Amino acid sequence: MEEQKYNLKESLAELDKLFDLSAKETDKTACEALAEKARIIYEQYPESEDIALLYARILVNLSTKQIELEELETTVEKLEKLQQKFRDSPDIALHYAITLLILSNKQTELKEIEATAEKLENLQQKFQDSHDIALRYARILFTLST
């Protein structure tokens, strides 16, 4: 894949386009290609929270198309790394929480779901004012209770 250099403003505009495409895309392979392009742009500006957030949004769109547990786990790990880098960003944390919930819905082993729930609990404790993260945590607790 040809790496193209962008300035920050152009990179944000390009990521906006990639996000829009990933939201409309139904093909997983095409969405993976969009996520890869987004990763390349993110790696050019790894300190930009705005770039990281758009990359996170594209990863969430990809996660909704992933059926295989291993693929989804890889995507969740990428979001976890983004969240660790931008620890104080409730927006990036929310996108990580969304993928954790998606992951929990694919997991079949109780211990796996509990480990995912613990990660969501930690996010919810850090971002107590985020009703959106709390909602994802409540949903995973509901899953565990059934």
Predicted regions and their residues:
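Intrinsically disordered, low-complexity polyampholyte segments enriched for Lys and acidic residues
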Residues: 3-5, 28, 61, 81, ...
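Amphipathic alpha-helical repeat scaffolds of TPR domains
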Residues: 4-23, 47-64, 90-104, 131-145
